[in-house]
Curated annotation (Swiss-Prot):
Residues binding Zn(2+) 1: C70, C72, C85, C88
Assembly, per entry: The RNAP catalytic core consists of 2 alpha, 1 beta, 1 beta' and 1 omega subunit. When a sigma factor is associated with the core the holoenzyme is formed, which can initiate transcription.
Its biological purpose: DNA-dependent RNA polymerase catalyzes the transcription of DNA into RNA using the four ribonucleoside triphosphates as substrates.
Name assigned to this protein: DNA-directed RNA polymerase subunit beta'
PANTHER family: DNA-DIRECTED RNA POLYMERASE, DNA-DIRECTED RNA POLYMERASE SUBUNIT BETA
Organism this protein belongs to: Erwinia tasmaniensis (strain DSM 17950 / CFBP 7177 / CIP 109463 / NCPPB 4357 / Et1/99)
Species lineage: Bacteria, Pseudomonadati, Pseudomonadota, Gammaproteobacteria, Enterobacterales
Cofactor binding comment, as recorded: Binds 1 Mg(2+) ion per subunit.
Catalyses which reaction(s): RNA(n) + a ribonucleoside 5'-triphosphate = RNA(n+1) + diphosphate
Length: 1407
């Protein structure tokens, strides 16, 4: 009978809902929820353990303690259900109602709700327009507030102290009304006429001009309107009735020994009830005012502590001095309701164990210990045992399994067949951290994992553990097989490259197998095919590396899609011919006819996937692994101490370097160089020496001399084990070999600065004590950093997921013509990322034309696959416009065309794909990887020698962009402008190289000249920045007063003296406002003007600048007037990288940002004030000019009379993304953030597709600020969801009304997450109290659009397989249909129950 009831209950559908609204609860509403008033603070009777009547656990109010049984025991059993016992007043029903029935407490005096009082900005304060301090004084009974002034001179809401109140009473009697406590505030709130107030405020807003006042008024108007629209009443922010949480949510558990463990809430409620009852009694007794007042204050404090302990004053502590956990603490933070229970749940049917290698497994398999499988698949086994009639009841089946009878194992095999399990390794940083496999039963207790999936899991076998989960329902198994099977996850969603790539042993084996060797055994044989090659090798007639000729048959498809065979005799080696046997049909032989390193193998698998598709690739990957393992074992490659060959040149190189260092030291002592310069130069010398040693060592290791068949000596690539491991990419790198056999080099201190004495020894020679100490210095920092950065990186991922969680592909094409221009990323002489890699998998936004013609190469809306990219390269297309997520026009989502290819699948993305989460994981996952990988080079400083010249790599035409230059006395060009770019253009007009040329460089070639490859075109001193004059004349010192702004440094040895400008911090008071400068005058002492402007030539000198000229000396243009020493850089490491990425995504303004031109026009300088210059830009069309004050110490890039465009850099510095957005637009800011983030990851060799970063940028740009509201109901200056503005404007344009104008805003990811439309999502992220308070006051509706909200309310997410369900609901809602609820009769129910039982609890009978 009980089962039948449960079954009936399961048949009733849960109610469907479309949105969740949060609002203030009115006292009547609280009473309507309640099942009775809690009058006593007692909980349960400690002798009988029965709840006390009218107490906090009262059974009459909250429901029975035992199922279907009243408290006194008069009614028991199901037949009485719904009866209310006349003796104890308890309803006979299930005990789980104690989780949902609420009670209430009638408060004897109103109390303010602390959230609306103290959560900043205080809602009560904003509404009443009173300072929080005053409201608190009223609430806590320190002063009176005037409620009605009547005919007196007292203002409404005026605060009166006790004395003032008494005086007023004497003067006016009862003409006026003033109260204290929450009653007073309640009265004030009740008397407010919201609509009237709104009107007056709007009028005020139109009249006022002051910015601060406007801000305050808009805030108040918004709050008032929220109250009007939501139907909340302001006086509901003051509680008169307090709801009581259901008792099962604040349990009281008896421990042994007569003590109780209780939830803190019970204590807090007890305090409230006690104080409330005492207050009631005092009021009945008409006690003196002062006593009542004190009791009311205490009640207010008790209610505050219950709602949010510690928000005001000291937190109330329990018996053990620990603050009590209040209602607010229950929901916020990592341990709160949201993050602990709603977003993270525990999973049953799971197990965990250590993992070991399963080298014989297929890619879709994993080894599952029998013990574990038996436990996990128990329900299925029970079902099968009953179905087969081997056990009559579940109990019998249970016994059989416990005895582990032989039949049980057979049934386990059946149950497990084709039933995938999920394997997960923590931390799950991206979706590949959980994959599905088919279990293979094994002996032992460790889970076996396929080696190729280790890269995706970031797993190794040094004791890692993994968890196993069993998908129970048919749908879950289907999803696991179709979407999560390891064979379906060959490509990484972050960059679209294979992630199932052999590494380590396999790579070494394949590399060893495909190497060739001069004069090996069997060289010159001619073989009939791979089979014979294998026979010859097995018979010992030929070596694996012998160069032979083999007949090879290749296949390729013709136009009719049929395989065509092509046979030829190819020069190759035995090993490569053997490897060819496992290469799938359709790949060219050239793919294996080379020494295969890790990159080549990856490329081979990628090619295989693109040409042949999924299945052959999976089989091929497995085969490469088996072969690789086999031949790695055959090779017997191992590391011996003699494999580390130390180059002979090492001693000589080190001696030379030491001599150079001694020379610099000498110069330093003679005063020719400063301490900073000396340090930098020493570091450079050692860095260069280290490079030379490394080069010599690698030459030594990488080649060996052998005698070929003709008896002649020949050099070939060496078979040294260490070299082979590094060369193949199996393990180790040149940097590590350098430490083993070269020299360890420079090390970093914990603060990142480089220690100038390098470690000249290597690990083979061994380190002495000092060297060892220096080593540990940096290595420790590496480990400490790792721990910190893992946490940081995890937090970054969490913020990214939170900001992007609701972004899903919702339609096929939004039809926009917008997009972003893509060009190759060029840094220095290298194309860091060619165009094809940037546009692959994107959709063209405009027709792509053949360069120089009007012929269409590719039409608009073409998805660029590999073939199309080849076409672009053929026609040498240099830039093209592609669709981008940032410019997608879809409201609430993104369209498939703007996103392009699904990187993990290789076709255009499907609707319902959760691209936001994928993007967040793709960016966050390497963050952790990188942070974990800092210490691998043992803190060895990897700082390259400072650049001091530009040497071009390709021949072509030199092009200088924004360059100004002068010719110096030697006839060379000297650059005098700041952001100069130098580009090399090839004959097709494509940019091949691009360099930044620093200020003060000497150019060997000018703009437009032809340059040969390898030519040096520019030189500069990397350690100092010169100040260069553009005019000739005589020097005149201004404001250079000894001891105030400058100091003379005379060299003891050389007697040369130079002037050093003091930093403003080092100057005396008199020197603070002086501005040391060098002025250039002509022979008569008149100012010389800068050419092309009417500004006198004078050069302001920054602090620390060194001048080696005297007053009045003659100089000519292009000469150096002064040198500013550059600070030495620390080491480049992702440490700088991770905070940098976080700063970019948080859109933080840099400390001293670049100053950009606000409008286009001509520059001039206005009147100067103390410490600032006035920059004036006058537009050419003569409209209003723009002024800005710039601190004098800022170096300006512009001169008087120069023309600038809006958004040009006026003064150097890191650019602020907000300025870029404001002045250059959305695309510029997207490009900036994308490039800067990619820069950090590229340094670490991590590839991430640009799309992911653009997705995050789109989410950062989702708000806009209204400039003028037009006919919309937005307020000027209000921040609104961008899509809402777009929708509103579309409606207005359709009706021919005035639309709103707006400016896009860039929000940092934390801000953007908190500003989302969904309050549930925001509350579960951070600042829960604030978010909920705001939402409740505004009466917000959550439409449950994102993923997070849906997870929290416990239904399918609107993405992936849940997308269809939500689309269906939307359709039904639009059609106005009622949700279909199947009506079930009792007969049908019992029939289907019987059917269920016969089928063995839903076991599958097809096996």
């Amino acid at each position: 009978m009980k089962d039948l009831l449960k079954f009936l209950k399961a048949q009733t559908k849960t109610e469907e809902f479309d949105a969740i609204k949060i609002a203030l609860a009115s006292p009547d509403m609280i009473r309507s929820w309640s099942f009775g008033e809690v009058k006593k603070p007692e909980t349960i009777n400690y002798r009988t353990f029965k709840p006390e009547r009218d107490g906090l656990f009262c059974a009459r109010i909250f429901g029975p303690v035992k199922d279907y049984e009243c408290l006194c025991g008069k009614y028991k059993r199901l037949k009485h259900r719904g009866v209310i016992c006349e003796k104890c007043g308890v309803e006979v029903t299930q005990t789980k109602v104690r989780r949902e029935r609420m009670g209430h407490i009638e408060l004897a005096s109103p109390t303010a709700h602390i959230w609306f009082l103290k959560s900043l900005p205080s809602r009560i304060g904003l509404l009443l327009d009173m300072p929080l301090r005053d409201i608190e004084r009223v609430l806590y009974f320190e002063s009176y507030v005037v409620i009605e002034g009547g005919m007196t001179n007292l203002e409404k809401r005026q605060i009166l102290t006790e004395e003032q109140y008494l005086d007023a009473l004497e003067e006016f009697g009862d003409e006026f009304d003033a109260k204290m406590g929450a009653e007073a505030i309640q009265a004030l709130l009740k008397n407010m006429d919201l609509e009237q107030e709104c009107e007056t405020l709007r009028e005020e807003l139109n009249e006022t001009n002051s910015e601060t006042k406007r801000k305050k008024l808009t805030k108040r108007i918004k709050l008032l309107e929220a109250f009007v629209q939501s139907g909340n009443k302001p006086e509901w922010m003051i509680l008169t009735v307090l709801p009581v949480l259901p008792p099962d949510l604040r349990p009281l558990v008896p421990l042994d020994g007569g003590r109780f463990a209780t939830s803190d809430l019970n204590d807090l409620y007890r305090r409230v009830i006690n104080r409330n009852n005492r207050l009631k009694r005092l009021l009945d007794l008409a006690a003196p005012d002062i006593i009542v007042r004190n009791e009311k204050r205490m009640l207010q404090e008790a209610v505050d502590a219950l709602l949010d302990n510690g928000r005001r004053g000291r937190a109330i502590t329990g018996s053990n001095k620990r603050p009590l956990k209040s209602l607010a603490d229950m929901i916020k933070g990592k341990q709160g309701r949201f993050r602990q229970n709603l977003l993270g749940k525990r999973v049953d049917y799971s197990g965990r164990s250590v993992i070991t290698v399963g080298p014989y497994l297929r890619l879709h398999q994993c080894g599952l210990p029998k013990k574990m499988a038996l436990e996990l698949f128990k329900p299925f086994i029970y079902g099968k045992l009953e179905l087969r009639g081997l056990a009559t009841t579940i109990k019998a089946a249970k016994k059989m399994v416990e005895r582990e009878e032989s039949v049980v194992w057979d049934i386990l095999d059946e149950v497990i067949r084709e039933h995938p399990v999920l394997l997960n390794r923590a931390p799950t940083l991206h979706r590949l951290g959980i994959q599905a496999f088919e279990p293979v039963l094994i002996e032992g207790k460790a889970i076996q994992l396929h080696p190729l999936v280790c890269a995706a899991y970031n797993a190794d076998f040094d004791g890692d553990q993994m968890a196993v989960h069993v998908p129970l329902t048919l749908e879950a198994q289907l999803e696991a097989r179709a979407l999560m099977m390891s064979t379906n996850n060959i490509l990484s969603p972050a960059n679209g490259e294979p992630i199932i790539v052999p590494s380590q042993d396999v790579v070494l084996g394949l590399y060893y197998m495909t190497r060739d060797c001069v004069n090996a055994k069997g060289e010159g044989m001619v073989l009939t095919g791979p089979k014979e090659a294998e026979r010859v090798y097995r018979a010992g007639l030929a070596s694996l590396h012998a160069r032979v000729k083999v007949r090879i048959t290749e296949h390729e498809k013709n136009e009719q899609d049929e395989w065509v065979a092509k046979t030829s005799i190819i020069d190759t080696t035995i090993g490569r011919a053997i490897l060819w046997m496992i290469v799938p049909k359709g790949l060219p032989y050239s793919i294996v006819n080379q020494a295969l390193g890790k990159k080549a193998i990856s490329k081979m698998l990628n090619t295989c996937y693109r040409i042949l598709g999924l299945k052959p690739t999976v089989i091929f990957a497995d085969q490469t692994m088996y072969t690789g393992f086999a031949y790695a074992a055959r090779s017997g490659a191992s590391v011996g101490i003699d494999d580390m060959v130390i180059p002979e040149k090492k001693v000589e190189i080190i001696t030379e370097a030491e001599a150079e260092v001694a020379e610099i030291q000498q110069q330093f002592q003679s005063g020719l160089v400063t301490a900073g310069e000396r340090y930098n130069k020493v570091i450079d010398i050692w860095a260069a020496a280290n490079e030379r040693v490394a080069k010599a060592m690698m030459e030594n290791l990488s080649t060996e001399v052998v005698i070929n068949r003709d008896g002649v000596e020949e050099r070939q690539v060496s078979f040294n084990s260490i070299f082979m491991m590094a060369d193949s990419g199996a393990r180790g790198s040149a940097a590590q070999i350098r430490q083993l056999a070269g020299m360890r080099g420079l090390m970093a201190k914990p603060d990142g600065s480089i220690i100038e004495t390098p470690i000249t020894a290597n690990f083979r020679e061994g380190l002495n004590v000092l060297q060892y100490f220096i080593s540990t210095h940096g290595a420790r920092k590496g480990l400490a950093d790792t721990a910190l950065k893992t946490a940081n990186s995890g937090y970054l991922t969490r913020r990214l997921v939170d900001v992007a969680q609701d972004l899903v592909v919702t339609e096929d094409d939004c039809g926009t013509h917008e997009g972003i221009m893509m060009t190759p990323v060029i840094e220095g002489g290298d194309v860091k990322e060619p165009l094809r890699e940037r546009v692959l998998g994107r959709v063209t936004a405009e027709d792509v034309l053949k360069p120089g013609t009007a012929d269409i190469l590719l039409p608009r809306n073409t998805l660029l696959h590999e073939q199309q990219c080849d076409l672009l390269e053929e026609h040498s297309v240099d830039s093209l416009k592609v669709r981008s997520v940032v410019s997608c026009e879809t409201d609430f989502g993104v369209c498939a065309h703007c996103y392009g290819r699904d990187l993990a699948r290789g076709h255009i993305i499907n609707k319902g794909e959760a691209i936001g989460v994928i993007a967040a994981q793709s960016i966050g996952e390497p963050g952790t990887q990188l942070t974990m990988r800092t210490f691998h080079i043992g803190g060895a400083a990897s700082r390259a020698a400072a650049e001091s010249s530009i040497q071009v790599k390709n021949k072509g035409t030199l092009k200088l962009i924004n360059a100004k230059s002068v010719t110096n006395s030697a006839g060379k060009l000297v650059i005098t402008s700041r952001n100069v770019e130098l580009k090399m253009i090839d004959e097709f007009g494509r940019t091949k190289e691009s360099y930044k040329v620093p200020y003060g460089s000497t150019m060997a070639k000018g703009d437009g000249e032809q340059v040969a490859a390898g030519e040096t075109v520019a030189n500069w001193d990397p350690h100092t920045m010169p100040v260069i004059t553009e005019v000739s004349g005589f020097i005149r010192f201004t404001d250079m007063i000894d001891g105030q702004t400058i100091t003379r440094q005379t060299d003891d040895l050389t007697g040369l003296s130079s002037l050093v400008i003091l930093d403003s911090a080092e100057r005396t008071a008199g020197g603070k406002d002086l501005r040391p400068a060098l002025k250039i005058v002509d022979a008569n002492g008149n100012d010389v003007m800068i050419p092309g402007s009417d500004m006198p030539a004078q050069y302001f000198l920054p602090g620390k600048a060194i001048v080696q000229l005297e007053d009045g000396i003659k100089i000519s243009s292009g000469d150096t007037l002064a040198r500013v020493p550059q600070e030495s850089g620390g080491t480049k490491d992702i440490t700088g990288g991770l905070p940098r990425v976080a700063d970019l995504f948080e859109a933080r303004r840099p400390k001293e940002p670049a100053i950009l031109a606000e409008i286009s026009g001509i520059i001039s300088f206005g009147k100067e004030t103390k410490g600032k210059r006035r920059l004036v830009i006058t537009p050419i069309d003569g409209s209003d000019h723009y002024e800005e004050m710039i601190p004098k110490w800022r170096q300006l890039n512009v001169f008087e009379g120069e023309r600038v465009e809006r958004g040009d850099v006026v003064s150097d510095g890191p650019e602020s993304p907000h300025d870029i957005l404001r002045l250059r637009g959305v695309h510029a800011v997207t490009r900036y953030i994308t490039n800067e983030v990619q820069e950090v990851y590229r340094l670490q060799g991590v590839k991430i597709n640009d799309k992911h970063i653009e997705v995050i940028v789109r989410q950062m740009l989702r708000k806009a600020t209204i400039a003028s509201a037009g006919s919309t109901d937005f307020l000027d200056g209000e921040q609104v969801e961008f899509s809402r503005v777009k929708i509103a404007n579309r409606e207005l344009e359709a009706n021919g009304k005035i639309s709103a104008t707006f400016a896009r805003d860039l929000l940092g990811i934390t801000k953007a997450s908190l500003a989302t439309e969904s309050f549930i999502s925001a509350a579960s992220f951070q600042e829960t109290t604030r978010v909920l308070t705001e939402a409740a006051v505004a009466g917000k509706r959550d439409e449950l659009r994102g993923l997070k909200e849906n997870v929290i309310v416990g239904r399918l997410i609107p993405a992936g397989t849940g997308y269809a369900y939500h689309q269906d609901r939307m359709r039904r809602k639009a059609a106005g249909e009622a949700p279909v609820v199947p009506q079930v009769t009792a007969d049908e129910a019992s029939a289907s129950l019987a059917e269920l039982l016969n089928a063995g609890l839903g076991g599958r009978d097809d096996e």
